[in-house]
Amino acid sequence: MKIYTRTGDKGETGLFDGTRVSKADPRVEAYGTVDETNALLGVAATSTTDAELRGILHDLQRDLFAVGAQLADPKWGVKPRKEKTRLTEGRVAELEALIDRAEAELPALKRFILPGGSQVGAVLHLARTVCRRAERRMVSLTATAAVAPLLITYINRLSDLLFVLARLASRRDGCEEIPW
């Protein structure tokens, strides 16, 4: 399979079902922003020496491929075509368990903190903000297209997890949080 097709040279792209749309289409904006989040998780995963964190990030990247695939398929916006692209309520619960586990290792927040910390922590903070943008793009898409509510729930919970993982990575790397 070639990486270039020349079919997008005039500002259009193909969706999963073959439909051609503008690269500025809200659906493309939504799954494109999910892809940006995924790329940032890749940067964090390759930057950390923490094997547990790297494994978590790789699992999240796989999830984001499923989210992107479902968003790129207008005929299956609510029900995914393939099992591989299906997220479940159980997966959201797993993210919540990861949040709880990470928070148990962290001091309670009493005020806002500045994004930053260690290099990995800073990348995870950036991933969190891009994830929030993905969520906003997905919510915007719901004005014109069907989007599975679970996808929005998943992305919302993911951004919470990324915040906690950013704090955890920075703490494990010996960096102090800077209060606002």
What are these regions (language model features)?
Residues 1-180:
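Phosphate/pyrophosphate-binding loop motifs in nucleotide- or prenyl diphosphate-using proteins
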